Amino acid sequence: MTPAHPEKWPVHVVQGGVDRQLLKDCRDLLAAAEESDGNPSISEQTLVTMRAGDSADHSLLTLALYAPDEDSDPATGQDLAGFAVVVEEPDRSGVLEIAVHPSYRNQGVADRLVRALQDRRGFDGLKAWSHGNHEAAADLAARYGYAPVRELWKMRMTTAEADLPEAALPEGVSLRPFVPGQDEDAWLAVNSAAFAHHPEQGSLTRADLAARMEEDWFDPAGFLLAVDAGGRVLGFHWTKVHPRHGSHPAIGEVYVVGVAPEAQGSGLGKALTLAGIKYLQDLGLHAVMLYTDADNTPAVSLYRRLGFTRWDMDVMYGPVKEG
């Protein structure tokens, strides 16, 4: 029998990379949560970091709350009720994400994890993501003096209803797929330059790229590069296909579109966006989604003109400034 309250359940704290069993437990929980919510509870980059552990660029803290059987060893054979992950930068700023198994919601699991985190690390320099605009997350954030500081919209279009213009590439520019073992350095350079003011994307490393290329979803055919007549990479559209998950059908994603600064303003970004969407349409997917910051008015306007509508949103919370 499981004790009635999370207060009595053990919180396991791991500094650095997590072991194989805990990673499996976390993945199983995330699969159940995504089936229930239709949204991932933890970002892809955080999962990559959990596998890799600490590095010169960040440190990792994971708190796992287990619901043990009454007579079992707390270290084995229990259900993972929820977990919290903090990815911290060298300056002690960090981002918190929490996932709770659907079977253990509305029992105080997230609050137990947050209080354990408060005791272990405190909240200095910490912001938190809620993937999906959940009322429970908003209530929990307010309880600890946090309020929304950023909205990341999820926008979606139904491919059957899409009537897209042709992708008009600038003169002398052509598209080709990414070639593993050849294009990594060129892509990293363009990505870094294109997202110089967007640290989450622009700071991706060779190791980060390699980790994504090892994921089951990676397909170089859907990783489109725009090159000039001399073969120089000017931009890219990396698409992604989320496979069918339970009752949720497969869906395409405009994963990331980037254009080198010297090619910006030429219409290449729009052409790349259209080319990637067309690629996903041709796969027979029923819909295509993307993420964009709510306050990025030019991007939101472009996507709306292409037929995207707001579907859901992720909310980042930060401490309320007094005064």
UniProtKB/Swiss-Prot annotation:
Annotated acetyl-CoA 2 binding sites? 257-259, 264-270
Pfam families per the UniProt record, alphabetical: Acetyltransf_1 (PF00583), Acetyltransf_7 (PF13508)
**Chain positions recorded as 1D-myo-inositol 2-(L-cysteinylamino)-2-deoxy-alpha-D-glucopyranoside binding sites:** 44, 200, 240, 253, 291
Q: Which CDD domains match?
A: NAT_SF (cd04301)
Cite the N-acetyltransferase domain residue spans from the record.
Answer: 77-176, 173-323
Q: Which GO terms describe its biological process?
A: mycothiol biosynthetic process
Q: Name one GO molecular function term.
A: mycothiol synthase activity
Task: Provide the binding site for acetyl-CoA 1.
Answer: 98-100
| Secretion signal span | none
Enumerate the InterPro entries for this protein: Acyl_CoA_acyltransferase, GNAT_dom, MshD_Acetyltransferase, Mycothiol_AcTrfase
Which controlled-vocabulary keywords does the entry list? Acyltransferase, Repeat, Transferase
Task: Please name the top-level EC class of this enzyme.
Answer: transferase
Q: Which reaction does it catalyse?
A: 1D-myo-inositol 2-(L-cysteinylamino)-2-deoxy-alpha-D-glucopyranoside + acetyl-CoA = mycothiol + CoA + H(+)
Q: Which SUPFAM superfamilies does this one have?
A: Acyl-CoA N-acyltransferases (Nat)
The UniProt record lists the EC number as 2.3.1.189
PROSITE patterns noted in UniProt: GNAT (PS51186)
Keyword Magnesium tagged: no
Record keyword Transferase present:
yes
**UniProt record similarity statement:** Belongs to the acetyltransferase family. MshD subfamily.
Which HAMAP family has this protein been placed in?
MshD (MF_01698)
Subunit structure of this entry? Answer: Monomer.
**Which PANTHER family does its entry note?**
L-AMINO ACID N-ACETYLTRANSFERASE (PTHR43617), MYCOTHIOL ACETYLTRANSFERASE (PTHR43617:SF31)
What this chain does, per the entry, is described as: Catalyzes the transfer of acetyl from acetyl-CoA to desacetylmycothiol (Cys-GlcN-Ins) to form mycothiol.
Query: What is the name attached to this protein's record?
Result: Mycothiol acetyltransferase
What species is this protein from? Pseudarthrobacter chlorophenolicus (strain ATCC 700700 / DSM 12829 / CIP 107037 / JCM 12360 / KCTC 9906 / NCIMB 13794 / A6)
